[in-house]
Structure formats: structure tokens, C-alpha cells
Amino acid sequence: MAQRFDRIWQNARLATLGEGRPGLGVIEHGVVASRAGRIAFAGPQSDFAADADAPERIDCEGRWITPGLIDCHTHLVYGGDRAHEFELRLAGASYEEIARAGGGIVSTVAATRAASEAELIASALPRLDALLAEGVTTIEIKSGYGLETATELRQLSAARALGEQRPVSVRTSFLGAHALPVEAGGDKERYIDLVCNEMLPAVAQSGAADAVDAFMETIAFSPEQTSRVFAAAKTLGLPVKLHADQLSNLGGAALAAGFGALSADHLEHTDEVGAVAMARSGTVAVLLPGAYYFIRETQKPPVELFRKHGVKLALATDCNPGSSPLTSLLLTMNMAATLFRMTVDECIAGVTREGARALGLLADTGTLEPGKWCNLAIWDIGRPAELVYRLGFNPLHQRVWRGR
């Protein structure tokens, strides 16, 4: 009896990203077939059943297929913008100076608190659409611009709604420990009490978040305060991830690893102790070259240390209004290659397989393997390096989410 599939993509070149394959896991003469939204076959044409049948067959005409792209660190939902702060930075003000003067995250908090859920969704949709237009099929979206329970929940609800309005998988992270709100009067301990005793239980009860994040930095929260948040999250059964070592080395990478974090992100100032700890815990390093570029950082993340110790490397846009108003994973890959000296294979893996790993989703997406969601990006390119090499050019031919 002939094998039945829903759709078959044939005459394609595949970059499977399978972990058991070298490099990008390339198959020159490949086929992908889907059934019930998942990959039922991904491999050489020669291994595909000659009598296979499907209502729809797509001739890819030699185009490349990669897994759908994954943006594993964004702050996509927020109110207002911070273009005026961009002008201040151009005039010489630093990110820290703007934050300490009441700008930065806190200014976005005011605009986000004033916005309705519908307004938050409407403002985020164009940013999401820009990412989808480049082949993104999975995105992580954080809260963190409410800094009080109602607005944090509203942000998370808006993020979930985006996944209902567009064909994309949305993962949400609660980032209540992002900054200190004005009404806290400088009392970080009391605010962390609020995060742990009120916000986190409300978030967990509502099911609004898939993970808990925090910003551990001299201008944000201490290692001790971050540990309190993570301990509370773990008690509630929520995995954690951390904005770590971006502006200074407070031991964020090692702290994240100690809590078994899915990922530690930024990492410009991480040392070898942190890299070793991440390797042991399986914590993914999420590098954010857009933020490095936009705020004109000079300390690069220690990519060689991560390679040396086998830490997995993911990439993301860090789309946010203050330090990375970026909605292009293609440009993110180019930045990672040119600024951080990452290889083409590392960059492409970083926005597919390793992005999935950073979200705890590798069992379901991130590679072209049977059983995973049929999330594909089909490209008009001659070789995968073009995805990293080109600037301001989008070679996406088709984006497929769950087989459609």
C-alpha cells in the first residue's frame, strides 16, 4: 500500500541540522514530507518511497530547506518607543547613565502600563510580521515592562494572543525582575518580595508563562535577589533563564547554571568559571549581537571559551525598544559572524537547533527530523552561507508552520 502524506516537498537541498550529522546536516537531493503537521520523512530522495502519495506536491526546484527559524529571546510586546534615548546615546550618554536618570526600561514601563491589551497586540504585530517574513516559526516573548502584577499578566496575555493571530509558536517568559519600578522607592528587597510572593504565584496559576527570567546586573538585581526569584520559580515548577553578565561580571552565567537554567543570555563579561558551569549544566549561551552593536559595547562574549568547553551557542534579536530595536534574524546572523567571529554553521544552528534547545523545545522543533513539527524555511539561495553573508536582503521563498 502506498504511503500517504499531507504534503511533499521534493527536489530540494536540505540543511537538516540533525545532531548526528556533520556541519549543517546537508542532503543534496532531499525530500520532506508531512503528516498531521509533523515531519513524517526528511531525507534523501533515494530513500523516499517511490509510491508515496499526497494531495499536494511542491517542487522546490533545487531550493534550500532549513528548519524554520527560532528567535529565542525577545521583548516584542511593549508600549511606546525610545527613539529619543537613541538620540541621547548618539550625543554621548551611556545605557547605564540613561537608566540611572530614570530612562531606559522604566520609561517603557510607563507607556506599557498605559496601554490596553489590544493596543499592545496592535503595536507588536508589525514587529512579529517582520520576523515571520524572514522565516521565523517560533518566538519567545518576555514580559518585564509592567513591574506590577496586572500589567505583567497583560503583557503575557498579549504575547499569547499573537500566537493566535499569526501562524507562529509563541513561548512566554515572565520577567518581573527586570528593573525597579518608581513606586518601589529604591527598595529592591521589597520589590523582590512582591515578585516572589504575588507576581510569580499569579503567573503560575494563570499558566501565562512558560519560563521565568531575570536581569542580574549592577543597574538591576543582585545575585542574592536573583536567586530568590529563581528559587521561587523552581518551587512553582517553572524553568528559568537569565540576562547575565551583559555589563559586568556578577557571576551570572554560573548562577544560571546552578539553577539548571535553560539559557543564560548576553554574556559579554562571562569568565571561564561561568563557561565551565554552563557546559556542565547544559545551559545554552544565547548571544545577542544586536544589543552589543546598538549600545556600542566593546567587550565581546567569550565565544572561544564557549567553544572550548562545549557550550551550545544560540542567537536571537533581543528585539526591545531600548537596546536592540531589531526585527531581523538574518541581520543578527551577519552581526554574530562579523562582530563575534561565529562561523556560518554556528550562526545557522544558533537560530534553529540551538534556539530550540534554549527554549526547551528541541524534542519538537529546530531540526528536520521525523516526529518534529513541520516548521520549514525554503530559501532562494545557492548555498547556506548566503543567509549569513547578505545584508538587507531577504531570500525567503516560503515559510511553513506545522505543515501549512
Swiss-Prot record:
Keywords: Cytoplasm, Histidine metabolism, Hydrolase, Iron, Metal-binding, Zinc
Ligand binding (Zn(2+)): H73, H75, H243, D318
Localization per record: Cytoplasm
Top class in the EC scheme: hydrolase
Cofactor note (record): Binds 1 zinc or iron ion per subunit.
Recorded GO CC terms: cytoplasm
EC number(s) per entry: 3.5.2.7
Binding site for Fe(3+): H73, H75, H243, D318
Pfam families given in the database record: Amidohydro_1
Cofactor list: Zn(2+); Fe(3+)
Annotated N-formimidoyl-L-glutamate binding sites: Y145, N320, G322
Source domain of life: Bacteria
Molecular function as annotated in GO: imidazolonepropionase activity; iron ion binding; zinc ion binding
The protein's annotated pathway: Amino-acid degradation; L-histidine degradation into L-glutamate; N-formimidoyl-L-glutamate from L-histidine: step 3/3
Residues binding 4-imidazolone-5-propanoate: R82, Y145, H178, Q246, S323
InterPro entries reported for this sequence: Amidohydro-rel, HutI, Metal-dep_hydrolase_composite, Metal_Hydrolase
CDD domains reported in the protein's UniProt record: Imidazolone-5PH (cd01296)
Single biological process term from Gene Ontology: L-histidine catabolic process to glutamate and formate
Catalytically driven reaction(s): 4-imidazolone-5-propanoate + H2O = N-formimidoyl-L-glutamate
Role noted for this protein: Catalyzes the hydrolytic cleavage of the carbon-nitrogen bond in imidazolone-5-propanoate to yield N-formimidoyl-L-glutamate. It is the third step in the universal histidine degradation pathway.
Family membership noted in the UniProt record: Belongs to the metallo-dependent hydrolases superfamily. HutI family.
Descriptive protein name: Imidazolonepropionase
Provenance organism: Bradyrhizobium sp. (strain ORS 278)
Phylogenetic lineage: Bacteria, Pseudomonadati, Pseudomonadota, Alphaproteobacteria, Hyphomicrobiales
